[in-house]
A protein has these predicted regions:
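Cell-wall polysaccharide-cleaving catalytic domain and substrate-binding groove, primarily
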Residues: 1-241
Length: 241
């Protein structure tokens, strides 16, 4: 069970990873993407007529916030099932408009709620992964998860990576048949002892899977531009919180 202080540190690290810990970064539409990324966890929200290969998470967060009794969700969000902006240009043109300003205020005032949502996703991830993993993978994944989780920065790594690149169970999240989620990172770790050694190997395995993703990606997506940032993020997993 994570302490309140550990949760606070993890939430702030995720926010730092995704948008430099800035309030402005809580509503972002990245170059080359077809959707905005919202909140400390850069939760994806798809426009109405777009369905990408990545798991959409912003609507799930809003449902979670409602279940937790959040009273300050902007009314327009509750009435809008799909992202109302259809392009990065229209999104950025409205960056300081009433809707995005109210959304940033809500997100900035509910950092702990977003952290709890990310934690809940992470805690549910292992069970989902074991269901879809091959019988040969299951024990390796279970053991590696326990080894990594035995340190506070390892626990942060497991939580952050699920939020960052997903569980690895969505068959659409593949390039040339190869995934890059938590399943693939855990399954491809090299044999290592529990503790900091496991956290360091998780970091290294994550970088290897992300390098493979870049290698297998459509060159027109230009994913190589993300390599340095992705590696920097994975490097934080090997360092104490």
């Amino acid at each position: 069970m994570l302490s309140a202080e550990s949760k606070r540190k993890i939430g702030n690290k995720i926010w730092q990873n995704e948008s430099g810990g800035t309030i402005n970064g809580l509503t972002t539409w990245n170059v080359g993407e077809e959707f905005p990324s919202l909140g400390i966890g850069h939760f994806i929200w798809y426009p109405k007529n777009f369905r990408g290969p990545y798991t959409e998470s912003f609507p799930s967060f809003i449902r979670y916030a409602q279940q937790r009794g959040a009273k300050d969700i902007p009314a327009w969000v509750l009435k809008t099932p799909h992202c109302p902006w259809t392009s990065r240009v229209s999104f950025n043109a409205d960056k300081n408009g009433a809707r995005l300003t109210s959304l940033r205020n809500f997100l900035a005032n509910n950092i702990e709620l977003q952290t709890d949502f990310i934690l809940a996703k992470s805690q549910a991830a292992l069970g989902k992964i074991l269901v879809v993993a091959t019988p040969a993978q299951r024990e390796t994944i279970r053991q590696n998860y326990a080894k990594v989780a035995s340190t506070s920065n390892g626990a942060y790594a497991l939580i952050d990576y699920v939020n960052f690149k997903g569980e690895g169970i969505n068959p659409k999240e593949r390039y040339k048949g190869e995934g890059w989620g938590l399943l693939q990172v855990l399954a491809n770790m090299r044999p290592v002892a529990s503790g900091q050694a496991a956290a360091s190997e998780f970091s290294a395995s994550a970088k290897r899977r992300l390098d493979l993703r870049i290698k297998n990606s459509d060159p027109t997506r230009g994913e190589n531009r993300w390599r340095e940032g992705w590696h920097n993020r994975c490097d934080t997993y090997a360092r104490p919180l």
